[in-house]
Amino acid sequence: MMRRQQIMDAAKKVFAARGFGGATIESIAEEAEFSPATLYLYFNSKDDLFASLNLTMLQQLTSKMEHVRDQALSPQKKIDELARALYEVYLLDPLNVVNVLRYQSKERLQRLSPGLSSQISDYTRKCMNTLAEIFEKGVRNGDLLDRNPAAFADIVWSLFSGLVLWEDTKKGFGSGKDLLQPTLELALEVINRGIKKTDVH
């Protein structure tokens, strides 16, 4: 188990420094101080290794979403907490989160070993269902617009993904200031106001 974690820690560094395309099993093995053959004992391919990091992020994200969902808060307060929770997931490992979001694709999922592919699909579904459940009670109680909670979840996830990737892109333009947190909070505030149900007189 320690070897597997050591390999994943090394992979995080190499993917962060070189990106998915520039990383190789050999460079990851060198960083981990193992032979490439040792890496293949734990991971079938570079894709599987990268996806294992993806799975870790999904597990952390799902845990944060479940915490927000289970709090005894109003729907509006939960949406405020959602912005904080998403940013906390990003802070756990910013470069890995960026890489994971940048390289998500159906084609990549199809290249994974069946067991890992199934795990990622299951956790993605669980994460999005939990995100939808944060909105579900508010819709049911009439506090939020009567729309599909899954659509709200898709909007929030798209916003988070887009903002993370855009902030990373801006760094390439020489913009050194990280505005992800205030921008994410503003985006969720706009959503919060927009989906709040108001009485029409």
Residue locations for each model-derived region?
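Helix-turn-helix
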Residues: 6, 10, 14-48, 52
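Short coil/turn segments at alpha/beta junctions that flank glycine-rich nucleotide-binding fingerprints
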Residues: 17-21, 71-72, 93, 141-142
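Hydrophobic alpha-helical connector segments
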Residues: 52, 56, 66-96, 153-156
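Amphipathic alpha-helical packing segments from all-alpha helical-bundle domains
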Residues: 59-62, 66, 111-141, 150-154, ...
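Hydrophobic/aromatic-rich alpha-helical bundle segments in the mid-to-C-terminal region
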Residues: 97-99, 139-187, 199-201
